[in-house]
């Protein structure tokens, strides 16, 4: 009985994780569409990610009296950040790297690595409360959907959400 409960719990956890990854894809698509629609907030970089292109992206946000709080990258772009070099990072970041082994923060922004992010794009965004909203009408819900006649356990996992970009810069 313990094993079957563990399997059910594990399956439900994996299903919730899949929904959360899909949320990431939807949010990234909305942010990229807003940037593409505006047109003048894009930084073109050929080859690996550079400090100059990141600095330009930060400038585009800061010129509107906002603070860049998140850098969202695919693992391919995160690899470029790791090789910026020891002379690039300040003492606090160097200490963080030595203690945790991670590059989790750059200038004023946290670095988020996601497999759902386009491997050729990097998003630099301001604080979420200045960009838009992520209304949740129905949070992730698990409903039983067993089929006792066939000796099957089942469930339906769903949520109702929205993504709104109010500020496209």
Describe the residue ranges of each PLM region.
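Sequence/fold signature of self-assembling virion shell proteins
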Residues: 86-169
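Long, contiguous amphipathic alpha-helices that act as assembly "spine/axial" helices in icosahedral shell
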Residues: 1-40, 71, 111, 151-162
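Helix N-terminus capping/helix-initiation residues
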Residues: 1, 50, 74, 120, ...
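Secondary-structure junction/capping motif
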Residues: 6, 34-37, 41, 45, ...
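Extended, solvent-exposed, turn-rich assembly/linker loops in the middle of proteins
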Residues: 33-103
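N-terminal short leaders/motifs
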Residues: 13, 17, 60-63, 105-112
